[in-house]
Amino acid sequence: MAAAGGGGAGAAGGGKVSFKIILTSDPKLPFKVFSVPEAAPFTAVLKFAAEEFKVPPQTSAIITNDGVGINPQQSAGNVFLKHGSELRLIPRDRVGALAAPF
């Protein structure tokens, strides 16, 4: 019975999960590690990760190391349990897109 918004670490639903997110569009494969509340919406994690890597969040997706897409309409805790902590960020505008003329 943890209070909503309480900072109690280890309380059910009040813990944190960490993700190592790798930017796949960069040949050097840079990564960042984020620690977020389990109950955080994964859409917020996706948006934050994209902004940290300076790529547009509206056209980005997160996949597993096996290439499986992740539905962002779930909590960060669910994603962590289903897919683990190591994920990849892909700016979707680079996947199969033609270069736009200037």
UniProtKB/Swiss-Prot annotation:
Gene Ontology cellular component annotations, sorted alphabetically: cytoplasm; nucleus
Cross-link (Glycyl lysine isopeptide (Gly-Lys) (interchain with K-? in acceptor proteins)): G96
Residue ranges listed under propeptide: 97-102
Entries under InterPro entries matching the protein: Ubiquitin-like_domsf (IPR029071), UFM1 (IPR005375)
Any one GO biological process: reticulophagy
Origin: domain of life: Eukaryota
Keywords, in A-Z order: Isopeptide bond, Ubl conjugation pathway
Family as reported in the entry's similarity comment: Belongs to the UFM1 family.
Function: Ubiquitin-like modifier protein which binds to a number of as yet unidentified target proteins.
Name this protein carries in UniProt: Ubiquitin-fold modifier 1
Organism: Oryza sativa subsp. japonica (Rice)
